[in-house]
UniProtKB/Swiss-Prot annotation:
Protein family: Belongs to the bacterial ribosomal protein bL17 family.
GO BP annotations listed: translation
Protein name from the UniProt record: Large ribosomal subunit protein bL17
HAMAP family: Ribosomal_bL17
Pfam families in UniProt: Ribosomal_L17
Length: 116
């Protein structure tokens, strides 16, 4: 039974799902705004917020945790430099999800997820 399990499966095996989440999180932190499906946007919100919280903490252990998840080493460096000052007064809620039009090919619900 999967009662109280929070991670959406996104119709993928665990290894593919983890790689997708890492790639989407990396892209969001690099670009600041990406367009994806609504389900994927909701799924990466938690990991993105966790990475920004780690950057605000700024310790060596937090940096190593971020390096283990985010693909780009330079992105981690810039995140740890910019996030503490950018999100100093914000205790959470670093992302915003905006719904957009359905995808033409299959009618999937699309959304734009962006950093606040």
């Amino acid at each position: 039974m999967r009662h109280r399990r929070r991670t959406p499966h996104l119709n993928k095996p665990a290894d593919q799902r983890k790689a997708l989440m890492r790639a989407l999180t990396t892209a969001l932190l690099r670009e600041g705004r990406i367009t994806t499906t609504k389900a994927r946007a909701k799924a990466i919100r938690a990991t993105t917020e966790k990475m920004i919280t780690l950057a605000k903490e700024g310790s060596l252990a937090a940096r190593r945790q971020a390096l283990a998840y985010i693909y780009d080493k330079e992105l981690v460096r810039s995140l740890f430099e910019q996030a503490p000052e950018r999100y100093r007064d914000r205790p959470g809620g670093y992302t915003r999800i905006l719904r957009t039009v359905h995808r033409r090919g299959d009618g999937a619900e699309m959304a734009v997820i962006e950093l606040v």
